[in-house]
Amino acid sequence: MAKIINVIGREIMDSRGNPTVEAEVHLEGGFVGMAAAPSGASTGSREALELRDGDKSRYLGKGVLTAVANVNDLIRTALLGKDATAQAELDQIMIDLDGTENKDKLGANAILAVSLAAAKAAAAFKGIPLYAHIAELNGTPGQYSMPVPMMNILNGGEHADNNVDIQEFMVQPVGAKTFREALRMGAEIFHTLKKVLHDKGLSTSVGDEGGFAPNLASNADALAIIKEAVELAGYKLGSDVTLALDCAASEFYKDGKYDLAGEGKVFDSNGFSDFLKSLADQYPIVSIEDGLDESDWDGWAYQTQIMGDKIQLVGDDLFVTNTKILTRGIENGIANSILIKFNQIGSLTETLAAIRMAKEAGYTAVISHRSGETEDSTIADLAVGTAAGQIKTGSLCRSDRVAKYNQLLRIEEQLGEKAPYRGLKEIKGQA
């Protein structure tokens, strides 16, 4: 038995200079797992709660000492002597100990850090890589794939201090034969984009996720500049590389309207969906995330009706990795894909349940980082171990993003042909 003999929590720093929770789980025999919870900027209102201290004299109120104390006291006491390989049991113990719908007693950041650390400790105990352990927990042992990266090379919205309303403009190197080749293509486009921006006299500073954050006249301008960079890098837009957007529309939804302040346009719900469709008619956009507010379910039905057969429509703030909300979406034919973020739901077991539910309903599942990240690369193993097929982990700079890409390179090297890179086939509506 992989007996837990100690659980340790500590406060560490995330990529935005804010505190977050790191946990260690120690087993008999010297096996140790360590993991850290990420943190979001544009967050869904129904996400599990990230417990912050609120003490303005420390880290401007963003300290996590209360969550850390919960790890070192209540959670530690509850898990001592338990089997680390029994992931579902461990997670349920913590969920029951918390006893709230959104984990606001112990904090989703506390529970998640321990949940992931336990999985890493269990993998070490079994002598297998984390992705292999996750595949076993998922009921799909040995079934792997390398994910298509959605590379966020131009940032706006809550991730950048500029006038661009849409939060993420991403490239997907779908024409690559391997993940390694896809990463190289993305890096070359990223560096070429820097040159294009520089030559136009535009800012080459980066946002939270490592993408460039220039001021632009319109959201369409962002797509035009990326198109220029893709072609200048020697690739063909539409076959070698496709585009994806994360609108994070909840962030500019005001009084029932979608207010694109950066370009001075205001849309009603259907009008904004029509606007997005017009962009997709001009450029090879194959995936749109959070194209409407999380509460605008009638609008989502219309958006799915007009674009859902050809474009992947991803629910992030809409579904918040929550099976109860996803069930409603599936029953009502809302969207056709879910974004998967560990900390929206707060445990590995619940995360795997959301991925499984999505796949069984014919939805795709896109594994994602948060804008506040650490060097923890667990999402790379999650993407491969569940054969999710797609990953969002930022741009090609900032080591908090690149850590995930580097872990994927290592995994591909280990697995070779056992983890195929399927390109466009992974994206809903493109197979």
Curated annotation (Swiss-Prot):
Record has Lyase as a keyword: yes
Binding site for Mg(2+): 246, 289, 316
GO cellular component, one term: phosphopyruvate hydratase complex
Active site residues per record: 209 (proton donor), 341 (proton acceptor)
Cofactor mode of binding and number, as noted: Binds a second Mg(2+) ion via substrate during catalysis.
Source organism, top-level taxon: Bacteria
Cofactor(s) the protein requires to work: Mg(2+)
PROSITE patterns in alphabetical order: ENOLASE
Disulfide pattern: none
UniProt GO BP: glycolytic process
Its EC number(s): 4.2.1.11
Pathway info: Carbohydrate degradation; glycolysis; pyruvate from D-glyceraldehyde 3-phosphate: step 4/5
Family matches, as InterPro entries: Enolase, Enolase-like_C_sf, Enolase-like_N, Enolase_C, Enolase_CS, Enolase_N
Keyword Metal-binding: yes
Any GO molecular function: magnesium ion binding
Localization (cell): Cytoplasm; Secreted; Cell surface
Keyword line: Cytoplasm, Glycolysis, Lyase, Magnesium, Metal-binding, Secreted
Enzyme class: lyase
Chemical reaction(s) catalysed: (2R)-2-phosphoglycerate = phosphoenolpyruvate + H2O
Binding site for (2R)-2-phosphoglycerate: 167, 341, 370-371, 392
Family as reported in the entry's similarity comment: Belongs to the enolase family.
Oligomeric form and interacting partners: Component of the RNA degradosome, a multiprotein complex involved in RNA processing and mRNA degradation.
Function, as annotated: Catalyzes the reversible conversion of 2-phosphoglycerate (2-PG) into phosphoenolpyruvate (PEP). It is essential for the degradation of carbohydrates via glycolysis.
Protein name (Swiss-Prot/TrEMBL): Enolase
Taxonomic source organism: Shewanella baltica (strain OS185)
Organism lineage: Bacteria, Pseudomonadati, Pseudomonadota, Gammaproteobacteria, Alteromonadales
